[in-house]
């Protein structure tokens, strides 16, 4: 399933206009409309840059805030749904979303330009910086884009795992420098050489993952459908699978904790069955957010989970830790979760 398909259901989203199919797909996106209530509409991604916050979401909206309470809309050159925003430093960042849209900023989010757009291509869900010049973007149905010039231009890359057609939902760089991608039907793939080559991991789960966080020196936390959370303390020790002949739809669920441990993972029992879409870490642990306003807190060792806040019914998509507070974004804009 698509990582953000839930938004089409809970948000009641519809196209801003009907397009004449005979005209073919547009060659460039339409600019997003400046909307007085943009801060109250669906926001899906949030990131900190310098002393401010940038959030992105429905209809290409990009918003900026100094305190997480008062938000101002920033002109956006694309009116497509934006799923994620990432910054390399205090100046350079990227927002990405539907129609393989990638927007770039070189001034800390004050202004944005179109770096990539293809109305015939798939939705993009996440992005990672490999170094100052090399970036990757991932998305639906195995979509994988490379940039070797700091994000100025992007090119698709085909490789065996991508050919499986599973959605790539999230990517992160672990503390040891390796990369981990999580996605549909339990997909986990790892790169030890800055994204040049990828290995398919033998996954402990057959449902979809929507997020991944670094954990410790070599580990990771992956989370997703129905509140499932798995932790590996050393991803480099997780066994791999051959891609040739692999069928993700033929896998049987693994219920035995010993078999899950043999794959290098352990289950974190969470007090929810709601799907979890976004997460962030602090020194005290991690916070994951999801359907119906669900908030799950993990301790620093990622061994125990709790729900420090009652769900309020409004789905949350992403969260960030800043100045001692957790700030989430979702169906009704930004929500201050407090210190938790």
Roles of regions detected by a PLM:
Residues 1-4:
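Positively charged n-region of N-terminal signal peptides that target proteins for export
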Residues 10-18:
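Hydrophobic h-region of N-terminal signal peptides that target proteins for export
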Residues 17-340:
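Residue-level hotspots at or immediately adjacent to binding/recognition sites across diverse folds
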């Amino acid at each position: 399933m698509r990582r953000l398909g839930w938004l089409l259901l809970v948000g009641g989203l519809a196209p801003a206009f009907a397009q004449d199919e005979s005209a073919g797909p547009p060659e460039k996106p339409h600019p997003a409309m400046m909307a007085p209530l943009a801060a109250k509409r669906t926001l899906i991604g949030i990131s900190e840059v310098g002393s401010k916050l940038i959030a992105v979401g429905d209809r290409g909206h990009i918003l900026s805030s100094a305190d997480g309470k008062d938000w101002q809309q920033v002109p956006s050159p694309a009116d497509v749904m934006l799923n994620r925003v990432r910054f390399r430093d205090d100046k350079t960042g990227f927002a990405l979303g539907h129609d393989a849209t990638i927007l770039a900023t070189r001034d800390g989010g004050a202004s944005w330009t179109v770096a990539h757009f293809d109305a015939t291509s798939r939705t993009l869900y996440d992005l990672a910086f490999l170094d100052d010049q090399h970036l990757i973007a991932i998305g639906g149905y195995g979509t994988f884009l490379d940039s070797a010039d700091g994000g100025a231009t992007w090119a698709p890359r085909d490789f065996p795992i991508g050919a499986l057609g599973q959605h790539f939902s999230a990517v992160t760089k672990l503390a040891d420098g390796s990369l981990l991608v999580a996605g549909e039907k339990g997909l986990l793939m790892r790169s030890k050489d800055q994204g040049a080559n990828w290995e398919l991991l033998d996954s402990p789960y057959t449902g979809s993952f929507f997020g991944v966080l670094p954990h410790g020196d070599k580990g990771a936390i992956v989370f997703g459908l129905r509140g499932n959370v798995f932790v590996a303390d050393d991803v480099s020790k997780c066994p791999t699978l051959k891609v040739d002949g692999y069928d993700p739809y033929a896998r049987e669920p693994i219920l035995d904790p010993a078999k899950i441990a043999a794959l290098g993972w352990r289950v974190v029992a969470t007090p929810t069955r709601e799907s979890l879409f976004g997460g962030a870490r602090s020194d005290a642990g991690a916070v994951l957010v999801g359907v119906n306003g669900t908030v799950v807190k993990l301790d620093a060792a990622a061994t125990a989970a709790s729900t420090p806040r009652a769900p309020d019914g409004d789905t949350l998509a992403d969260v960030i830790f800043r100045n001692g507070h957790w700030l989430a974004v979702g169906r009704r804009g930004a929500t201050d979760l407090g210190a938790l």
